[in-house]
């Protein structure tokens, strides 16, 4: 699992602010910038917490992010106000028992145990099948669980879809059932 650093959240906010009226309505949790580092193969992972090189990797990522933030001249931020608390939490997280969930889950399935996976969001927010660019950074469809958990698709026995009686959306983007008249108010 990848870690969302304080600078990821700052990059998310800076990018959103710079887009002005064209912004897509990010949740500002740093998820998009974290996925950018994941696909760029320079992100921080939970396993890095116990690697002995966490501080070095964090500082390299921090330096990269500060360089990117410098491009947003109108964006003001205070990294130090959240960084020490985040580093403390990261240290505490690194002291927990960390396991390889891919092996753990597959061993459980091999032993005949039932595994329940829960996902969030819906197909219209899926990075590949959703209303791009107004999507999240991950696969939100049932197949995304296989990728995220390290479980082969042939191991899934049953998928149960749950939906709300009414649609909602965070941010902007297409909303086919939105009522723009008095009823929608």
Region locations from a protein language model:
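Non-transmembrane, aqueous-exposed alpha-helical and coiled segments at domain scale
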Residues: 1-185
């Amino acid at each position: 699992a990848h870690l969302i650093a304080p600078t990821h959240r700052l990059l998310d906010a800076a990018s959103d602010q710079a887009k002005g009226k064209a912004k897509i309505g990010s949740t500002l949790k740093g998820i998009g910038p974290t996925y950018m580092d994941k696909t760029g193969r320079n992100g921080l992972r939970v396993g890095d917490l116990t690697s002995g090189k966490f501080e070095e990797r964090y500082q390299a990522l921090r330096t990269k992010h500060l360089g990117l933030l410098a491009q947003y001249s109108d964006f003001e931020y205070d990294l130090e106000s959240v960084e020490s608390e985040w580093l403390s939490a990261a240290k505490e997280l690194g002291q927990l028992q960390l396991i390889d969930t891919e092996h753990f889950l597959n061993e459980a399935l091999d032993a005949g145990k039932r595994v329940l996976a829960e996902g969030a969001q819906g197909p219209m927010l899926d990075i590949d099948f959703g209303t791009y660019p107004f999507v999240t950074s991950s696969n939100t469809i049932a197949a995304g669980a296989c990728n995220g958990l390290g479980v082969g698709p042939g191991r899934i026995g049953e998928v149960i879809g749950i939906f709300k009686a009414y649609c909602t959306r965070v941010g902007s983007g297409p909303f086919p059932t939105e009522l723009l008249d008095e009823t929608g108010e």
